[in-house]
A protein has these predicted regions:
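Short Pro-Gly-centered flexible turn/kink motifs
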Residues: 1-12, 328
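Non-catalytic surface loops within mature trypsin-like serine protease
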Residues: 12-14, 332, 425, 603
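Terminal connector regions
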Residues: 14-41
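Surface-exposed helix-capping loop/turn segments at secondary-structure junctions
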Residues: 15-23, 255, 335-337, 471-476
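Beta-propeller domains with acidic blade repeats across secreted/periplasmic ectodomains
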Residues: 40-448, 456, 464-466, 509
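Long, ordered, helix-rich scaffold segments
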Residues: 398, 414, 421-680
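Short intrinsically disordered, low-complexity coil segments enriched in acidic
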Residues: 1-6, 44, 96, 210, ...
Length: 680
């Protein structure tokens, strides 16, 4: 056949590259096409690099002045670590996924995957004790500890593994399959990043190229053993929920699974800031995302489940690095200088580095600005993709460590490291009990921890309080103490923590939440909206208040939560709230609001096209006006659009409607003019 050069490519390889500069030059040259060649260079660099021992790897790394790197744990203590987390005692739990073979192979053949508990008993910054909690569950990819046991993501299941007597050995006969259906097609895009949210739900991520249908298992479900094949089919109790890229959550008491947001690529790493705003880091596509419940986000490939999304929410990052970020963690502790407070830490696989970004509030959301190249491994076989912040305020990064950095093959099965990044002079206060078992503290102390400078302690304390409330063992006066904190504390972040703690312990009535909708703090109002809608059935009193707030609330953050709430109520209940939201012309250029409002309005259009077109005529958000008209045409309701066009006032309004009308007609043939078209 004919061979033709369609674009020039110049490959320059000298063993060491300035990854960020090369990426920017390459994108300018190619118009952002062909950047995959950089992945090839990075993979080649890894395969050709000299293997470094953990000690040599530490010496080879560079870090910001005033900080140090040390190996907290490494082979042979751990191998093939795929996930890690903390427990109430400040011990680190590590999932060794020794069943991983390649992106397309591996499930249970190795048979020796383990869940380890690592401890630094003398607090010298190095793990010195290793306990095997569980062995033989195939393909462990995500872990979280809380509420009496281990929550383990191991496709196809989300398992609860209890340890009722606290002997650090799994009660294997009592393991529960809470969810099933997680896919495994692309083994480095599986269920990952389990993380307790402020609202008592367990959050996680799922990759784009591993389609899954997730739901409650039929009867008790099936727990897989070494040597067994991944199932061709799983059976559900009821229907499953589709997810093929996104953020999800599961409530351990209500036993309910939800997709929080659809899209992305291979999101790995999720965390929330002091206001409870969630962020993820992602691979391949831009790296940083503000996650809003109900959001539909840019996808690396494929189509959205809903064909009427029309446009999706884009990254908040205003810059690019080499692709493949993971492990997002917002620094909310006291060991680092104030400069790092609220910054988001991420590992970067292709840059072999830990990077920080600044989360700058903007409208209803954020702009992610590059802060620092905090730590560079200078080691082409360093594969960091998960991070944690510990009880002492230090930052930890998990290094899968392999000569194949993209997971196509496992070339070094017996390696794995966890590095600690710490200030040479920690600013953390070493108060009495800082490293004690949080689960052994009384409720008074757990409430006090909600004002801690260490978010680690506030969060662990909240999970413990939640567990006590579930068992009916919450001490008398605990809710009263939290209410006092909420009402009297001058720190807005501490008030939010008190609100969350009240919620997870059952201390918030609807009447109290309705009252909080008038709070002076926008984030208190916003979170009260979300909590009132948690069960998808806000009361008539809440709906009336929401409609008023949609018109009158001055905060774009509150309006964002109202837009998100639209998807958690019936179609009939959405109209008044939507009418208030579309009246804010100041939101027309907002990064999130017009699209999120549209996602809530979209199913209303085919349900009542005439009323929807009235909403379009009243809307002061051009995107919403355009999309309502387009959706009406897609629903075959040309007459409704034609009639609205005839009544529309102003050239801009007519132009917005016509754009939607034209887009809806695109590709159609033999379209008959609607009856009113001549008059219009």
């Amino acid at each position: 056949g004919k061979t033709e050069t369609i674009r020039h490519q110049i490959h320059v390889y000298g063993g060491k590259l300035n990854d960020k500069d090369l990426t920017q030059h390459w994108m300018r040259y190619t118009g952002q096409r062909g950047t995959a060649v950089l992945w090839g260079l990075a993979q080649r660099e890894g395969r050709e690099a000299k293997f470094l021992t953990p000690e040599a790897a530490v010496k080879n790394s560079t870090i910001e002045p005033g900080f140090a790197v040390n190996s907290w744990a490494n082979e042979p203590m751990i191998t093939q670590p795929m996930a890690f987390c903390w427990d109430d005692r400040g011990r680190m739990w590590v999932a060794e996924n020794r069943d991983y073979e390649s992106r397309g192979r591996g499930f249970s053949a190795s048979g020796d995957s383990r869940i380890l508990i690592l401890e630094d008993t003398d607090r010298d910054g190095v793990a010195d004790k290793r306990t095997v909690f569980l062995e033989g569950i195939p393909f462990p990819s995500a872990v979280a500890v809380g509420l009496g046991g281990l929550w383990l993501g191991a496709p196809p299941n989300l398992l609860f593994v209890p340890d009722r007597n606290g002997d650090d050995k799994a009660d294997v006969d009592d393991i529960e399959v809470r969810l099933t259906g997680w896919g495994i097609r692309d083994r480095h895009e599986v269920v990952n990043s389990l993380h307790w949210g402020p609202d008592g739900w367990l959050y996680g991520c799922q990759g784009l190229f591993t389609p899954s249908v997730v739901g409650k298992p039929k009867e008790e479900g099936r727990i897989y053993k070494p040597g067994e094949a991944y199932p061709k089919k799983v059976e559900f109790d009821g229907e499953g929920t589709q997810i093929n890229g996104g953020v999800w959550r599961y409530h351990p008491v209500k036993d309910r699974f939800e997709v929080v947001a659809h899209g992305f690529s291979n999101p790995w790493g999720i965390d929330y800031d002091a206001k409870g705003q969630f962020f993820i880091s992602a691979c391949v596509i831009p790296h940083l995302w503000h996650v809003i419940p109900g959001g539909v986000y840019h996808r690396q490939g494929g189509r959205h489940f809903n064909p009427y999304v029309y446009s999706d929410i884009r990254t908040i990052a205003d810059h690019r690095h080499r692709s493949a970020h993971g492990g997002a963690r917002v620094y909310l502790s006291d060991a680092f200088p104030d400069e790092y407070q609220g910054k988001i830490f991420m590992a970067n696989i292709h840059e072999h580095a830990v990077l920080t970004d600044e989360l700058v509030p903007s409208g209803s959301g954020f702009v992610g600005k590059h802060h620092k190249d905090f730590m560079k491994a200078n080691n082409a076989q360093w594969i960091g993709f998960s991070m944690e912040i510990g009880p002492g305020g230090d930052v930890y990064v998990l290094d899968w460590h392999d000569a194949d950095i993209c997971g196509k093959d496992v070339l070094q099965k017996d390696t794995g490291r966890i590095f600690r990044l710490s200030p040479k002079e920690s600013l953390a206060k070493d108060w009495a009990g800082r490293y004690a078992d949080v689960a052994k503290l009384n409720d008074t102390k757990l409430v006090e921890y909600q004002t801690s400078a260490s978010a680690w302690h506030a969060r662990r304390a909240r999970v413990v309080l939640q567990g006590r409330a579930i068992k009916g063992k919450l001490a008398k006066g605990t809710h009263r103490a939290l209410e006092k904190m909420f009402l009297k504390n001058k720190n807005a972040d501490h008030r939010l923590r008190a609100l969350w703690a009240l919620h997870v312990t059952g201390g918030l009535s609807e009447s109290k939440l309705l009252k909080h909708l008038d709070d002076k703090d926008a984030h208190i109002r916003a979170w009260s909206i979300q909590l009132l809608c948690e069960d998808n059935n806000p009361s008539s009193d809440a709906l009336r208040k929401f409609a008023s707030m949609a018109k009158l609330d001055s905060s774009p953050v509150v309006r964002l939560y109202l837009a998100s709430a639209l998807q958690r109520m019936s179609l009939g209940d959405r109209w008044a709230i939507a009418a208030g939201l579309v009246a804010h012309d100041e939101d027309a250029g907002d990064h999130n609001l017009p699209k999120l409002i549209w996602y809530g309005i979209e199913p209303m259009v085919p349900a009542d096209p005439a009323r929807a077109m009235e909403l379009a005529r009243a809307s002061r958000l051009p995107l919403v006006t355009e999309y309502i008209a387009r959706r009406a045409v897609d629903a075959g309701q040309l007459e409704a659009v034609s009639a609205a066009l005839g009544q529309a006032q102003g050239e801009d309004k007519v132009a917005d409607m016509l754009r939607g009308f034209s887009a809806g007609l695109r590709g159609l043939r033999d379209v008959k003019a609607p009856p009113s078209w001549g008059a219009t």
